[in-house]
């Protein structure tokens, strides 16, 4: 067999289920054929994903419950004072799910109730699939480029992974918010970036942590404008829904996670993980504060490491550090909130540090965790999502995403100490030996793309 091209080795985790390893042609030829079939694979995957989710919804009814809440939240505006009073009851689990978003989000969700719910659900999940593809493409631009066919293959697999697949099944808005935050970090226009972060934070508070990214890269105007836009969304809510806005800020906002099953294995935050280990909700006690302080220190060191190679800063990885910290620090980080793993894997396999020792292994670990849906497997041993106490081995296994996230940050610190690359590829791709796409040039969006992603994933 001909020698395996390095990029094929980097992509093996992605194509292991699609390409036989014992055929006569070289691995590179197999990968080329796979790439040629990318549109068909992508189309088939999307059809199966949409059909399976819609079929589950039609048969069981236990799907799109987050989307149900968005629709009901928008419709509640027709009955003033009911936005934070209603509950959607899950038909299978009999859980009562309230509307937990700011009033501004309900205003944006208002048009959703004007269509039949089945049609809304179909269009919503198609849009989510499109957002996953756009996320992959934008992540490729961060690392220097990449072909549309590779993006199709990534998307075809990603929509079946736990975070994106779970988001599609429940109709979560998180993928849309991730795409908006990614573009905010990619854009060099302060008003575009600030507008996107302010609006997304107005819809769901968690994207507000991205302000730390803009402060860290000294984009002061963007950080300030994002705060102005956020408060503008609060003002819009107050003008249109004064009672609901007064009720949400600061009351319901400060109660985030208070009535939620924080000890469920689906909650992959430090609060959830530590609660399962000790057998009760740790709340905001010393144990949680200690874990967050240690993680914050590790995140700061990882941030510094990402700016230490050649004096340049890896923008995508720096953004990922902030988002990873935000996930583990949140009171509740359901598995479908971890959609940021998709750009993380793209960075590990195709980014400027891809030749660093451990990058491919770490990417494969994340890939395996996402495909195996470890929390889903562990949930089968969970009698109720409200039961916190569980056997020690299940409690420790339930730290899986948290441990992988902290390990990723630690790896960034260790890898950042190496200014050279063991295979001599310091000038082999975008960001290696030169600024890693620190500021994109105008017009590069329309630059011809590399047909062969095996060369630095499309250098510019």
PLM features per residue range, with description:
Residues 3-7, 178, 185, 430, ...:
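Intrinsically disordered, low-complexity polar segments enriched in Ser/Thr/Pro and acidic
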Residues 15-193, 217-335, 388, 393-397, ...:
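Primarily membrane-embedded glycan-assembly and transfer machineries that use lipid-linked glycans
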Residues 138-147, 187, 203, 220, ...:
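Hydrophobic/basic alpha-helical segments enriched in Actinobacteria
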Residues 53, 349-440, 449-452, 457-460:
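Aromatic-enriched
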Residues 2-4, 8, 16-19, 437, ...:
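Acidic, Ala/Val/Gly-enriched low-complexity intrinsically disordered segments
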Residues 197-214, 330-340:
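Transmembrane helices and adjacent periplasmic/lumenal helix-loop junctions
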Residues 301-302, 339-352:
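Alpha-helical transmembrane segments in multipass membrane proteins, preferentially the mid-helix core
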């Amino acid at each position: 067999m001909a020698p395996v091209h390095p990029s094929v080795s980097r992509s093996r985790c992605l194509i292991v289920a699609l390409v036989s390893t014992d055929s006569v042609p070289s691995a590179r030829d197999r990968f080329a054929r796979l790439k040629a079939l990318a549109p068909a694979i992508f189309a088939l995957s999307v059809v199966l994903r949409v059909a399976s989710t819609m079929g589950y919804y039609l048969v069981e009814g236990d799907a799109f419950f987050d989307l149900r809440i968005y629709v009901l939240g928008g419709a509640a505006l027709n009955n003033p004072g009911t936005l934070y009073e209603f509950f959607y009851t899950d038909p299978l689990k009999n859980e009562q799910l309230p509307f937990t978003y700011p009033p501004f989000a309900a205003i944006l969700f208002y048009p959703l109730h004007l269509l039949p719910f089945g049609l809304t659900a179909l269009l919503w999940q198609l849009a989510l699939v499109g957002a996953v593809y756009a996320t992959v493409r934008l992540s490729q631009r961060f690392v220097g480029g990449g072909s549309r066919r590779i993006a199709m293959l990534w998307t075809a697999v990603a929509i079946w992974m736990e975070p994106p697949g779970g988001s599609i099944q429940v109709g979560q808005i998180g993928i849309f918010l991730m795409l908006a935050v990614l573009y905010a970090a990619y854009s060099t226009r302060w008003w575009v970036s600030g507008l996107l972060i302010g609006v997304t934070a107005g819809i769901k508070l968690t994207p507000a942590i991205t302000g730390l990214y803009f402060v860290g890269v000294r984009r002061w105007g963007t950080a300030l404008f994002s705060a102005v836009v956020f408060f503008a969304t609060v003002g819009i809510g107050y003008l249109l829904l004064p009672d609901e806005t007064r009720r949400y800020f600061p009351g319901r906002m400060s109660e985030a996670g208070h009535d939620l099953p924080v000890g469920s294995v689906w909650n992959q935050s430090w609060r959830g993980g530590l609660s399962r280990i000790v057998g009760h909700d740790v709340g905001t006690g010393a144990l949680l504060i200690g874990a967050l302080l240690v993680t914050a220190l590790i995140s700061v060191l990882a941030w510094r490491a990402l700016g230490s190679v050649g004096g340049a800063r890896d923008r995508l990885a720096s953004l990922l550090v902030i988002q990873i910290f935000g996930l583990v620090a949140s009171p509740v980080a359901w598995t479908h909130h971890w959609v940021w793993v998709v750009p993380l894997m793209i960075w590990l396999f195709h980014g400027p540090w891809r030749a660093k020792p451990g990058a491919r292994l770490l990417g494969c670990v994340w890939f395996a965790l996402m495909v195996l849906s470890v929390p889903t497997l562990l949930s089968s041993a969970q009698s109720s999502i409200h039961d916190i106490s569980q056997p020690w081995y299940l409690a420790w296994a339930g730290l899986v995403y948290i441990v992988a996230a902290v390990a990723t940050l630690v790896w960034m610190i260790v890898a950042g100490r190496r200014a050279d690359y063991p295979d001599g590829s310091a000038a082999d791709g975008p960001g290696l030996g030169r600024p890693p796409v620190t500021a994109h040039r105008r017009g590069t969006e329309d630059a011809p793309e590399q047909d062969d992603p095996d060369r630095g994933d499309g250098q510019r």
